[in-house]
Structure formats: structure tokens, C-alpha cells
């Protein structure tokens, strides 16, 4: 039952235009076409870019493999893009896989033994590696060696294979789920942060050029403001706004055109969609601002509990519109203000409102 709820939550997330997860293989192909190829083309993440630039330059000067890199942060911020940039900047090949795909030690061994000197192996969702596969990875990361078993039963024996020096780039949205032994083997650990509207506007402008779409600065900024700090969402919204501009306007994406297109898509000024507003309005109007238990809230809006916890709540909490308390969910003063409602007269939200004044 729990697994079914998780699958339902993932399906709901994929359907939302403001979801940070890739919606389809077609969208993944679209992302690849817009992906920057070099570090100089990569917008945002200034600290991470600066660190990688120094570490890669030093490794190239010594003709060594770059130290192993762990990239973590919310989905859609550019972890896969950075892995490709690292390989291109280092002038080596990139092999890409993901944690769930590597089911057996032999799957990983086949990848490792086919790597050439200083190549990059990119493992997405590395937190989902199985324990038996992870055990094989430890000596590979430390000593560039793996132990494989040949034969079965009493005749089985362990054979040590030497590997070419390589760089593992691991990406995860859940760094806390990595085991300590695996985390400790990464020499470079970088957290990707949400983007500012100004940074996203630069990304939207760059993507518009690649799509041969005409956009003005105000139009790019309007899209950026509603993209929840995530380049993947910004590029997805840009595609839909471009369609609107070509059909309903003169093909030029102005602030007014972007606003009309995003209103048609039910994406409001802070990046909320219908589901976000439905959740907040239920707490505000049906439960007087809260607190309300998660099961009551799920019943009130007709969604699964996992959908609320995994898909809807994280962004609302992060942006300060919702709080989780021991007694249940509580709408904050920002939620009241967003919907043009007056200050609550009493209760836990009253204190939050007073704190914001």
C-alpha cells in the first residue's frame, strides 16, 4: 500500500508543469539540447563553479584524474549538466548510469573495467545503490581495484583486477541517505542551491536563443520569477510561453505575454499551481489556518498522504507558506497575505502574523 502511494505521488509530480522532475523522455531530450557544454556557459552556482574550475585545472596540469565528486541538492538544478561539463572540460569520456540500474556487482564491474584513463563515471541517484554493489565500489574509488569472484561453491576464488584511474561523479537529491563509508570517499562535495530570479532570467534568455524564440528582458524575468528557483521548470515554462506567443501574440515574449500565458497555465506570481493553492486554501478556509492533521488534510483535498508530503509540502514549507508542527499543518502569515486575507484573530497563526509585522 505504501509503495502504491509513493508511485501515485511520483505520477502526480510528473504531471505538474511546475514539477522539478523530468516529465518524459521527450523533455529529457529537450533538456540535452539546451544544456551548456562548458563551465563558462553554466549560469549560477558561482561557488561550485569556482571550486570545480580550480580543481579541474590543477588535475589537468598534473595529468591526473579529477578527485571523485559528489553533487547533491534538489532536482532540476543542474547536477547532470555539471557531470557532462566536468567530462568535457577534462577532455575525457563520460559513462552514465543510475543507482537503481546497477542491480548486481557484475553490472558495476563491467562499467569500471571498460573505463579509459581519467574517464568520468556518472552515477545518478547514487543513494539508491544496493549494499552489495556499494561494497564493490569502495576499493575501486580508493585503490582503482576491484575484487571479483570467479567460480562457485568451494572452487570459487577472488581475483583482483586493476582499473584505470577514473573520476566518479555521484548525484543525489538525498545526501542524508548515503552511507558514511561512501560519502567519505568523495574528495569534492558540492551542494547546489536554488537559483535567483536574475540567474534564471539569464538561463531563459540563453534558452530562448537556442530555440530561436524572441524574448525581451522583462519577459524572461517574469518566467524566472515563477520557476521556483529551478532551471528545469524555467525551461519548461519557456516552451509553453513560446507556444502561446506564437499563436496568441506576435511571437515576441514580453512581460504581458508571459503573464497571460502563465495565467492560462494556472501558474501564479510566486510559482504556485492549482494543487498548491488547493492545499493552502483548504487549511485557511476549512481548518481556520490550522493546525490540521495530515490525514484530515488529505481527505479534504482528495489527495494521497504521500502526494502531500513528498510533492506539495516541500516547496510551501521552504518558501514560508506552511509549517509542520507537532499538532499538524499550519498556514503562515505569508499564506494569508498571498490570498489577500486579513490577520487571523487567534491561534498559532496569530503569533506567526505578529512576528512578520
UniProtKB/Swiss-Prot annotation:
Catalysed reactions, semicolon-separated: ATP + H2O = ADP + phosphate + H(+)
Chain residue ranges for the region called Head domain (RuvB-H): 269-357
Domain notes: Has 3 domains, the large (RuvB-L) and small ATPase (RuvB-S) domains and the C-terminal head (RuvB-H) domain. The head domain binds DNA, while the ATPase domains jointly bind ATP, ADP or are empty depending on the state of the subunit in the translocation cycle. During a single DNA translocation step the structure of each domain remains the same, but their relative positions change.
Localisation per UniProt entry: Cytoplasm
Ranges where the record places region Small ATPAse domain (RuvB-S): 196-266
Family: Belongs to the RuvB family.
Highest taxon above the source species: Bacteria
UniProt GO MF annotations: ATP binding; ATP hydrolysis activity; four-way junction DNA binding; four-way junction helicase activity
Purpose: The RuvA-RuvB-RuvC complex processes Holliday junction (HJ) DNA during genetic recombination and DNA repair, while the RuvA-RuvB complex plays an important role in the rescue of blocked DNA replication forks via replication fork reversal (RFR). RuvA specifically binds to HJ cruciform DNA, conferring on it an open structure. The RuvB hexamer acts as an ATP-dependent pump, pulling dsDNA into and through the RuvAB complex. RuvB forms 2 homohexamers on either side of HJ DNA bound by 1 or 2 RuvA tetramers; 4 subunits per hexamer contact DNA at a time.
Family matches, as InterPro entries: AAA+_ATPase, AAA_lid_4, DNA_helicase_Holl-junc_RuvB, P-loop_NTPase, RuvB-like_N, RuvB_C, WH-like_DNA-bd_sf, WH_DNA-bd_sf
Protein name, as recorded: Holliday junction branch migration complex subunit RuvB
CDD domains assigned: AAA
Keywords per UniProt: ATP-binding, Cytoplasm, DNA damage, DNA recombination, DNA repair, DNA-binding, Hydrolase, Nucleotide-binding
Enzyme Commission no: 3.6.4.-
Binding residues annotated for Mg(2+), in chain numbering: 80
Taxon lineage: Bacteria, Pseudomonadati, Pseudomonadota, Betaproteobacteria, Burkholderiales
Complexes and interactors: Homohexamer. Forms an RuvA(8)-RuvB(12)-Holliday junction (HJ) complex. HJ DNA is sandwiched between 2 RuvA tetramers; dsDNA enters through RuvA and exits via RuvB. An RuvB hexamer assembles on each DNA strand where it exits the tetramer. Each RuvB hexamer is contacted by two RuvA subunits (via domain III) on 2 adjacent RuvB subunits; this complex drives branch migration. In the full resolvosome a probable DNA-RuvA(4)-RuvB(12)-RuvC(2) complex forms which resolves the HJ.
Principal localisation: cytoplasm
Keyword set includes DNA-binding: yes
A GO term from the CC aspect: cytoplasm
Region entry Large ATPase domain (RuvB-L), spans: 4-195
One Gene Ontology biological process: DNA repair
